[in-house]
Amino acid sequence: MTQNYRITLLPGDGIGPEIMAVAVDVLKVVGQQFDIQFDFQEALIGGAAIDATGEPLPSATLDTCRHSDAVLLAAIGGYKWDSLPPHQRPEGGLLGLRAGLELFANLRPAQILPQLIDASTLKREVVEGVDIMVVRELTGGIYFGKPRGIFTTETGEKRGVNTMVYTESEIDRIGRIAFETARKRRGKLCSVDKANVLDVSQLWRDRITNLSQEYPDVELSHLYVDNAAMQLVRAPKQFDTIVTGNLFGDILSDAAAMLTGSIGMLPSASLGASGPGVFEPVHGSAPDIAGQDKANPLAQVLSAAMMLRYALDQPQAADKIEQAVLQVLEQGDRTGDIISVGMNLLGCRGMGDSLIKALAKS
């Protein structure tokens, strides 16, 4: 029986349209193989939306996304819009999208692919086999807590204030996603906080610990954030799934990403309690190579695989895409950002063609 899904495509800016085209081609092939029918709808976001409508997230785009099963986003931003006021820049489109879809969980995988292990700046024996998922709370914590702002004291001195706030319900909902994610992986969850100093982290640790009683099959551990950062570099293979707050997750997810040596290979997902999630590569819009057929589409393709796995419950189709990525790398196909001696240099379209051939063979 054919499964039907409505997918909103947000190509965005820079290399976005190029890498999105590859991901769509891959999804169409996998759809045929697994009897999945995709109804793709394209909408504007970021700089492209500013140029066309004057705002980074048109209401029509948000409405289209809300009526989708999932949203596949490519890239946002570029030099062209850097002179705009901060609240009018392309990046505001992504923040508005997350808020409008009520997305509170950001999933950032960091996996060392054996074909690219030498791209890491760490020793082979340290990073070989690393496969980490960072689950970051996305809508609370110090980035959104109030009071906030820069104030003038009675003595005329400037005083900057930000407030780190989490409620029980906010902690519980991100905790459940983290436990469920760990359960689907290797059954280990590390909660990262600063409970030795911060009251808000003490509540975080208490709630995560209480929640663990509902997941006896998941092994829970706790680390302070400073130690977690050190352990990520010292012995990253000890980690399976990490859950943490907004600020700590912002930092640790980027640190984990660079264990792989190529941020151009990394996908991500932003999820809510219900409704569509947003799936996108970690990398930026790379306006310096836009339109030159030099972009690496693999992170976009892997984001499509995450969409299949986490939004559409199609793990076999996701596996098929991930295996195709490994196959093209194994046969030596590379884009310019991951090229090494003896490998085959391909452009964005060429890498897409190679993926389609790999999917057809498997």
From Swiss-Prot:
It catalyses: (2R,3S)-3-isopropylmalate + NAD(+) = 4-methyl-2-oxopentanoate + CO2 + NADH. Pathway: Amino-acid biosynthesis; L-leucine biosynthesis; L-leucine from 3-methyl-2-oxobutanoate: step 3/4. Disulfide bonds: none annotated. It is found in: Cytoplasm. One of its GO terms (cellular component) is cytosol. InterPro entries: IsoCit/isopropylmalate_DH_CS, IsoPropMal-DH-like_dom, Isopropylmalate_DH. Keywords: Amino-acid biosynthesis, Branched-chain amino acid biosynthesis, Cytoplasm, Leucine biosynthesis, Magnesium, Manganese, Metal-binding, NAD, Oxidoreductase. Its cofactor is Mg(2+); Mn(2+). SMART domains: Iso_dh. NAD(+) binds at residues 78-91, 284-296. The record marks Y143, K194 as: Important for catalysis. Binds 1 Mg(2+) or Mn(2+) ion per subunit. Its EC number is 1.1.1.85. Mg(2+) binds at D226, D250, D254. GO terms for molecular function: 3-isopropylmalate dehydrogenase activity; magnesium ion binding; NAD binding. It comes from the Bacteria. GO terms for biological process: L-leucine biosynthetic process. Substrate binds at R98, R108, R136, D226. HAMAP family: LeuB_type1. Homodimer. Belongs to the isocitrate and isopropylmalate dehydrogenases family. LeuB type 1 subfamily. Catalyzes the oxidation of 3-carboxy-2-hydroxy-4-methylpentanoate (3-isopropylmalate) to 3-carboxy-4-methyl-2-oxopentanoate. The product decarboxylates to 4-methyl-2 oxopentanoate. This is 3-isopropylmalate dehydrogenase. It comes from Nostoc sp. (strain PCC 7120 / SAG 25.82 / UTEX 2576).
